[in-house]
Amino acid sequence: NEKAKDYIRVLDEKSQRLKQLTEDLVEASKISSGNIKLEFMNLNLNELVQQVNGEFAERFEGRNLDLICILQPEPLLIRADSRRIWRVLENLYVNVCKYAMPGTRVYVDAIKKDGKIQLSIKNISENPLNFQADELTERFIRGDVSRSTEGSGLGLSIAKNLTVLQHGSFNIYLDGDLFKVTITFDEAV
């Protein structure tokens, strides 16, 4: 019967959400306690970004987001843990999917400058950004209007803490409805 199928679908969605929240809480707890093992290696940030772009292409299309990605032709090598840097990028892209205004562009660019590798992601927010940038990386903090979307309020906090654990810097800039996040690492030698 249709009603039973709807209940099962809702239960499945809620259990998936609970599973994700639990994983986020465990990850946040490990990070804050320092109980996380990092395996550093040289990674090409260009390749990672291209992989994440591929993973999120369908989701971006579903939100009618036009991805403009500008990467340098030469490899942009950083020293990081591949699983953890993937999680950083995944959290940033999930954030774009949830909060970017549909029908707008998302800009992703990576550059090498003065021995540093910098990745920036910019988008126009669907909701007003009437709070301080540093509030967004506090645990469980979400803009009031965003409460209608799924999320734990941990995504940007986890992304920032994982970036810092890997000796990178993580900065958020807000300007009107423009949201920009920049992560920076030393260039690997």
Predicted regions and their residues:
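Conserved catalytic submotifs in the C-terminal HATPase_c
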Residues: E39-L43, E61, D66-L76
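Short beta-strand/loop element within the Bergerat-fold HATPase_c
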Residues: G103-G115
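Conserved glycine-rich
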Residues: H167-G168
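Short conserved segment of the HATPase_c
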Residues: P128-I141
